[in-house]
Amino acid sequence: MGKRVVIVGPAYPLRGGLSTYNERLCKAYNDKGDKAFILSFSLQYPSILFPGKTQYSTEAAPEKIDIDTAINSINPLNWLRVGKKYRKLAPDIMVFRYWMPFMAPCLGTIAREIKKNGKTKIVAITDNIYPHEKHFYDHACTKYFVNSIDEFITMSHSVLADLKKLVPNKPSTYVAHPMYDNFGALIPKAEAIKSIGLDPEYRYLLFFGFIRQYKGLDLLLKAFAKSGLKDHKTKLIVAGEYYEDSAPYKELIKTLGLQDAVIERNDFIPNGKVANYFSAADMVVQTYHSATQSGVTQIAYHFNKPMLVTNVGGLAETVPHNEVGYVCEKDEQAIANALNDFYTHSREAEFSKNAEAFKKQFSWDKIMEAVGGKQQQQG
């Protein structure tokens, strides 16, 4: 008989990478015979705290996934009520997603209530221990959350190191971020380029995902200008919603003379269109100023796309340099040199073939095995 597993975190109708991950993990559990569903949010962020246009998807709900939209992130009475409900339900495992200290009081309180039943194993998949943008309450809130958890899984060694400083004696382990294989099949490049209204005479680099300072779009724009690729029928697609003021970026594009070389698609890219953008690109570029791990990397792997990443956080852990792409320091010239090397030496076919082989290690089974087993202490 399979286990009863509850995944705690965002899910449909909430949109974004966390929802995509949780829904795919839930599917993986059910596919192997467990009974899994998602405990999600009726209110995730108050609208005043959400930087994007909307938190909600306009697409159809994922098939064959049960979702309980019950958690109000800012209502302590709700946390106690939800915790008591799941304490009585007593699933075998509760898998909490943790990504920012704002959620710590809510999730930590629910976890504490559930633990009172003495039966349910409480595991956290920790995307971050500390956020990219710091706040005075980060340490206290995170400490409150981690003290409520039995075992931890991190998806980068840098997060594992942060976790060890907070709770050195709790079981924890590293498992690489699994590959997103739920965005459909690779589309022939010419067809994909046409489908998103671009000129098939050009080659395209892709910057994908919501835009905040730590994502390093400014660094990429400067490097792209330095590379001179705009004069060689190559353009940069920036596909993602601004989560901060777009004016400095637009001014930078103008200052660098890149108005005709940068294609901005600054709405949230729905799941049904992700394949079109990745299939149209020669390489996916992530010039982050800071990072832990990246879901974008695991979408790129699904589509066998070469990648350029900066040497921050856990990005370099999953992109072997000169095999599936480039690992660069946060330096405009180094990034420009790598971009030029990619095209000058026609690296796409080689890197793509290597990505197809390398991606086989990024399975959802590994996450499920880590959740189910007693974790080994890793340093």
Put a short name on every predicted segment.
Residues 9-15, 26-88, 159, 164, ...:
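N-terminal strand-loop element at the rim of the active site
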Residues 321-333, 341-346:
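Conserved acidic donor-binding segment of nucleotide-sugar-dependent glycosyltransferases
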Residues 276-292, 305:
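Acidic donor-binding loop of glycosyltransferase active sites
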Residues 286, 300-301, 306-309, 319:
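Short hydrophobic beta-strand element within catalytic cores of glycosyltransferases
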Residues 247-272:
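Nucleotide-activated donor-binding/catalytic signature segment of Leloir-type glycosyltransferases, i.e.
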Residues 147-187:
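Donor nucleotide-sugar binding/catalytic pocket of nucleotide-sugar-dependent glycosyltransferases
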Residues 41-45, 208, 235-248, 267:
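Glycosyltransferase donor-sugar binding loop
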Residues 198-215, 221-224, 237:
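Conserved donor-binding/catalytic core segment of Leloir-type glycosyltransferases
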